[in-house]
Design a protein with these regions (language model features):
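Conserved ankyrin/ankyrin-like repeat signature
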Residues: 19, 55-59, 84-85, 115-116, ...
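Ankyrin repeat domain, specifically the short helix-to-loop turn at the C-terminus of the second helix
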Residues: 24-30, 58-69, 87-95, 118-125, ...
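N-terminal segments that cap or nucleate solenoid repeat domains
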Residues: 1-42, 136-154, 200, 212
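Extended, hydrophobic interaction surfaces within ordered domains
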Residues: 80, 87-120
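Leucine-rich solenoid repeat scaffolds
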Residues: 106-121, 260-294
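Extended amphipathic secondary-structure runs
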Residues: 194-222, 226-229, 245
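Ankyrin-repeat boundary/"N-cap" motif
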Residues: 2-8, 32-50, 69-79, 98-107, ...
Length: 294
């Protein structure tokens, strides 16, 4: 963050509530200003960098009472499963569905923040597109996004992700290379029926919802496609492996998923993703499948 925030950041990281209080009292704009680098606000920094701090709720309350913006930090809570601060933000008026576009619930599903997803649903978050319904395994709602002829209704939504569109990316706090990579990936997407279906299919796989995945396959989802909407761009098998869903992995392989496809970010197979996440048994299972298919 910008230099003006550095003493407050140090106080947050030291879990020093009194020091943060003194700094904000001396300069209330610390709570309301936006940084041009790294975390956009001090409250968002607290959400992400002080998740295990004993005084995190008191520090968050201090910033909220000083006028901090709430919706961005709520999405940050969704990205890291920070339920405790999220409850405070929601109680303080944060919009459970966000300020439009990408919602906190979508953020929670993208990052596999399961407690946050439950909290947001309990607080009234809406399941307003195909991606969310697939990620939650809501087969009853998935069918409602299709017309009788199999086409998608407008309510199915378009592909989206945490980093917004090109204008948001270009004005973000990422460095030049980070902005370039995100912009290139965003520009490669298509928002036709097939692409939206494939995106939703990966959400079903990443959360282990076999019934939802089957419904989407029945509607034409492509099992081995790497869809738009992801920075670490992989197949449904990659994401099932990352999140440790053995039954989903077996389902996908039984339905013809390739274990040899490499993701577009770091060039790993699903076995590599399982290894990265510490799922040793799944890694070994997938490695054996790779050997059998070589």
């Amino acid at each position: 963050m910008d230099a003006k925030f550095h003493p407050a950041i140090a106080a947050i990281k030291a879990d020093d509530l009194q020091r943060l209080h003194d700094l904000v009292r001396a300069d209330p704009t610390l709570a309301t200003s936006r940084s041009s680098r790294s975390h956009p606000t001090l409250l968002q920094c607290l959400v992400l960098d002080a998740k295990s701090s004993a005084n995190k709720l008191a520090m968050a309350r201090l910033l909220v009472d000083a006028g901090a913006e709430l919706n961005g930090p709520l999405s940050a809570c969704a990205s890291c499963d920070n339920v405790e601060v999220a409850e405070l933000l929601l109680d303080s008026g944060a919009a459970v569905n966000g300020a439009g576009g990408w919602s906190p619930l979508e953020e929670a599903l993208y990052w596999n923040s399961r407690r946050m997803a439950r909290l947001l649903l309990e607080r009234g978050a809406t399941i307003h597109n195909l991606r969310i319904a697939a990620g939650l395994g809501r087969v009853d709602l998935i069918e409602g996004f299709f017309n009788k002829d199999g086409s998608l209704k407008p309510e199915a939504g378009t592909i989206n992700w945490p980093w917004g569109d090109l204008s948001v990316i270009e004005n973000s706090n990422f460095g030049p290379e980070g902005r370039r990579q995100l912009a290139a990936r965003f520009s490669s997407w298509r928002n036709d029926r097939q692409s939206i279906l494939n995106n939703a299919f990966v959400y079903a796989c990443m959360h282990g919802h076999i019934d939802a995945a089957q419904v989407l396959l029945n509607h034409g989802a492509q099992i081995d496609v790497i869809p738009g909407g992801f920075d670490y761009a992989g197949t449904g098998l990659h994401y099932a492996a990352l999140n440790g869903h053995q039954p989903m992995i077996e389902f996908l392989i039984e339905h013809g998923a390739s274990v040899n496809i490499r993701d577009e970010k770091v060039g790993n197979t699903a076995a590599g993703w399982a290894d990265h996440a510490g799922h040793d048994q799944i890694r070994d299972f997938l490695k054996a499948a790779e050997s059998a298919n070589s």
